[in-house]
Amino acid sequence: MSGLYDAFQRRLHVTGTLVTETGLHIGAATDGLDPTAVDNAVVRLPDGRPYIPGSSLKGVLRSFMERLQNSPGHWLVSPGAPPSECLHNESRKDLVKQFKRQRRSERELAEFVWDHLCPVCRLFGSQEFAGRVLVADLMPLEDRVLLERRHSVAIDRDTRTAAGGALFDLEVVAPGTRFALSILVENPSDAQVRDLMVVLLALSNGEIALGAKTASGLGRVRLVDARIADYGARDVLAAAWGGARPSYSLAEYVRLLGLEAEEPRVSREALQAALAALGPEVTWQQAQAVLREVFGGERGA
């Protein structure tokens, strides 16, 4: 069973720039008496510039992948609830007691837990298993970042008028702000890489929103200039001696995904032709359709 972290086998490093297309608000905890301070401030660095917590981006990427993986009879969003296949926390507690009574090893328990996790938990992690995806905090690329203050008012659902005392300010990062993106994926399988690339394609097409008030149009972001380095232990050693690790653009890497499949259902030429027919502007829906046809709808392993 190759799901556990026995040894370093493969690492995926995704870099790029995340650009805000509309105002972005990721809130910070505020507790002050300054009457001039904004009611809902954005999270900031010590130097006052806003940043995007890696956990915030990881959360929306995971949520998007859950929606892609969901299908009738295979619902992943409610772990442990039928017909979900994912092991939930209470089941794990019972399993620990059972395995101890049977004097079974921790290794056996870990393998059992792995075998009963859904594809999303295997990639992004859960209470039972450390995730493979590591998203660093996204730092602003500009020395000075423009922030906007927007005035809002809550609406009473019954009267459809402004609720009393419900006027508040919302601080947002201005559109066009750039943040440096860095994602590491440790020991992913080929299927997990394909699933993650579909999610990144959606992010590059501006189809994933981030932060608060997304229903009101805030939080639209887009991944640009993405590069993917896919390397193993030998590549790490080669880099230590001055060698270069292979790196691809997102579009290039999507076209190469099927070439390392364990059991491709089409020839290399047919796969290249199918992906080339998509053109330079590949959407995640198109890529997902081709990859599912090639790999028979395989879900993340």
What are these regions (language model features)?
Residues 1-154, 158-301:
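RNA-binding basic/glycine-rich loop and surface signature characteristic of RAMP-family CRISPR effectors
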